[in-house]
Amino acid sequence: MGSCSPQLPLICLSDQTLKPGSSKWVKVRSDVRKALEDYGCFEAKIDQVSMELQGSVLKAMQELFALPTEAKQRNVCPKPFAGYFSHNGLSESFGIKDANILEKAHEFTQQLWPEGNKSIKMIQLYAEKLAELDMMVRRLILESYGIEYFIDEHLNSTYYRMRLMKYIARPDNDITAAVGANVDNGANDNADGDANVNDDGASIGVKVNVDVGDDVNDNDSVNIGVGVDINVETNVNGHLDAEANGDATAWVVGAVSGNASVGAKEANVDAELGLPSHTDKSLSGIIYQHQIDGLEVKTKEGKWIRVKPAPNTVIFIAGDALCALMNGRIPSPYHRVRVTEKKKTRYAAALFSNPKEGYIIDSPKELVDEKHPRAFKPFDFVDLFNFYHTEAGRRAPSTLQAFCGVSAGK
């Protein structure tokens, strides 16, 4: 089975001889381009982050999440859903803008520990190393398309946001689903929805634990697939009890049969979702899973690849902004988190690069030709982000295409 299971490309970025202009650099540059054109992401073997630093980051995260609730709630941010969130004791997360910059990390520390705390230095150093890795990969990408002149402008037009996440082990009798498209820019907010489904007079209680991502606005509607093996398709309107989410509504789509079991394979997959299928809106993201897996990436053929954590590996994933910048040459892949571990706490960290406000994303002329006609109109990332908050943006099969696609007719 293992040999038949699809896997993401694994690219070694840890070789000390990997320097611009070297033969190794040229080979890796080609591998990165092919992996991103084929999958929109790849696994990276790295040595920029030592095992010792990884262990220190985990301890720092555990220390963060062990703080009293009132202390954690001091992690606030003017940007909606970009600070700390926790609901129902199932998941919680912190957000740190410019986590790679020491001064900004200190500001985050002051929110939680006014007296100071040295452990945050480990997180800042970790973010700094991941940022260096991200910039190297984006440099490789631009070089591979022959637009070296654009590298400095591109790298200087972005900033980073880090997300630290903790998924608490679920009870065996919970059916877990999630909502939250853009993990690239913020927290996962957890909410409850309880619903009863009647089938020939039988009442079946369904509890749904929902992770709501940072980009959910008031009055938003979101679709959640819940696979309960009951053979009768039904729509259940479940209210999201989320303080930060206003009166957003989750539509729970279930399938129920007389035995009310969760035996179907598809039902089990839906029931284990910790974050549903989505594309990121960022330029890029680097994701680290500590020991417990969960991330799955969808291929062009519609197959799901489950990414198993391995020592000294991270996942580089392209977002919608990078897809637009590269004129569609690099896709932003659909991915999800499916939590199958029932008795273990899952920790994960992600660093996302985003265009700065006011910077216009426009494909370089070298990427537009007869074979690759212009696919997207120029846009400000903030406008894309705001469009994503609208009903039209939420309902669109592709937010990017609906917002600025040449075929969108805007």
UniProtKB/Swiss-Prot annotation:
Q: Where does Fe cation bind?
A: H278, D280, H335
**EC code:** 1.14.11.-
As for family, the record states:
Belongs to the iron/ascorbate-dependent oxidoreductase family.
> Can you name the source organism?
Arabidopsis thaliana
Q: Sorted alphabetically, which keywords does the UniProt record give?
A: Dioxygenase, Iron, Metal-binding, Oxidoreductase
Entry cofactors: Fe(2+)
Name of the protein this chain belongs to: 2-oxoglutarate-dependent dioxygenase AOP3
- GO MF annotations, alphabetized: dioxygenase activity; metal ion binding
The record ties this protein, via PROSITE patterns, to: FE2OG_OXY
Q: PANTHER family this protein is in?
A: 2-OXOGLUTARATE (2OG) AND FE(II)-DEPENDENT OXYGENASE SUPERFAMILY PROTEIN-RELATED
Q: Does the keyword Iron apply?
A: yes
Instruction: List the InterPro entries.
Output: DIOX_N, IPNS-like_FE2OG_OXY, IPNS-like_sf, Iron_ascorbate_oxido_reductase, Oxoglu/Fe-dep_dioxygenase_dom
Q: Where does 2-oxoglutarate bind?
A: R346
Task performed by this protein: 2-oxoglutarate-dependent dioxygenase involved in glucosinolates biosynthesis. Catalyzes the conversion of methylsulfinylalkyl glucosinolates to hydroxyalkyl glucosinolates.
